[in-house]
């Protein structure tokens, strides 16, 4: 019997420059399990916009993301305003999406569980 570890329970790994980005069918397979996350047509980033009641909740969420990013050494682009936060994930060393991006997405989603 094979037991698969949930993405949120995995850790990001170092991805060497020159490694290949994740292939589109695999991206789409992961994406189907990640409600609210989106991949633009160029398949280079993974994005999601989160909404909150106020600025305090938004900033608290951003701060929580930065802690996870620090622990995982995988840092998203974060854009936020009064009650909204957009998270953009990509693996810079390969100029595309890797499993690390989906691990971070799952960990970010888990912050709101």
Curated annotation (Swiss-Prot):
Reaction(s) the record says it catalyses: (4aS,6R)-4a-hydroxy-L-erythro-5,6,7,8-tetrahydrobiopterin = (6R)-L-erythro-6,7-dihydrobiopterin + H2O
Pfam families associated with the record: Pterin_4a (PF01329)
Signal sequence residues: none
The protein's enzyme class: lyase
Keyword Lyase found: yes
Keyword tags: Lyase
HAMAP family associated with the record: Pterin_4_alpha
Family membership: Belongs to the pterin-4-alpha-carbinolamine dehydratase family.
GO biological process assignments: tetrahydrobiopterin biosynthetic process
EC number, UniProt record: 4.2.1.96
InterPro entries: PCD_sf (IPR036428), Pterin_deHydtase (IPR001533)
Protein name per its UniProtKB record: Putative pterin-4-alpha-carbinolamine dehydratase
Organism listed in the record: Hydrogenovibrio crunogenus (strain DSM 25203 / XCL-2)
One Gene Ontology MF term: 4-alpha-hydroxytetrahydrobiopterin dehydratase activity
């Amino acid at each position: 019997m094979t037991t698969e570890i949930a993405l949120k329970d995995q850790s990001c790994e170092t991805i060497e420059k020159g490694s290949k980005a994740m292939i589109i069918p695999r991206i789409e397979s992961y994406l189907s399990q990640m409600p609210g996350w989106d991949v633009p047509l160029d398949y280079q980033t993974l994005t999601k916009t989160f909404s909150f009641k106020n600025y305090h909740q938004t900033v608290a969420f951003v701060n929580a993301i930065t802690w996870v990013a620090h622990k995982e050494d995988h840092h998203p682009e974060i854009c936020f305003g009064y009650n909204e936060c957009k998270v953009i994930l990509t693996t810079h060393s390969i100029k595309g999406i890797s499993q690390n991006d989906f691990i971070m997405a799952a960990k970010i989603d888990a912050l709101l569980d």
